[in-house]
């Protein structure tokens, strides 16, 4: 694996981890809270953002205006059944969600969830490293590169991995501060 390819794969893992972080509630209204909520729409699981305009009215309120009013009940049901712990208010045209402040206990749960997402991201990075190192060892065994080249490349791969793991740790720290901020 080339260094550029390794970094591209690791960047994808970082982006996936960030998307996971964005779905965690922080006590402030944020449209990305609903990214993981899907609606059973004509027999197919469809993301809410494909069915409606989602906007934040203020720091505590999210507004969902469906493109098709007939899916209003389905959207409301999906939000109610999600693990977000928020209750939608349906006025017949628009769904409003008041995002209540988080309790201390709920904040700790979300910090654990953020840690879990960070760990999943680190595992993905380590898998990319393992694949790259295995390729280096195979190339060395096949005589395509020298032992010294292989060791240098493996050392470089480890440095890249360490850099990306530190980036995930930084993002986790930022997310935890955001969650714990009252």
Curated annotation (Swiss-Prot):
It is found in: Cytoplasm. GO terms for biological process: translational termination. GO terms for cellular component: cytoplasm. CDD domains: RRF. InterPro entries: Ribosome_recyc_fac, Ribosome_recyc_fac_dom, RRF_sf. SUPFAM superfamilies: Ribosome recycling factor, RRF (SSF55194). GO terms for molecular function: ribosomal large subunit binding. It comes from the Bacteria. Belongs to the RRF family. NCBIfam families: frr (TIGR00496). Responsible for the release of ribosomes from messenger RNA at the termination of protein biosynthesis. May increase the efficiency of translation by recycling ribosomes from one round of translation to another. This is Ribosome-recycling factor. The lineage of its organism: Bacteria, Bacillati, Cyanobacteriota, Cyanophyceae, Synechococcales. The gene is frr.
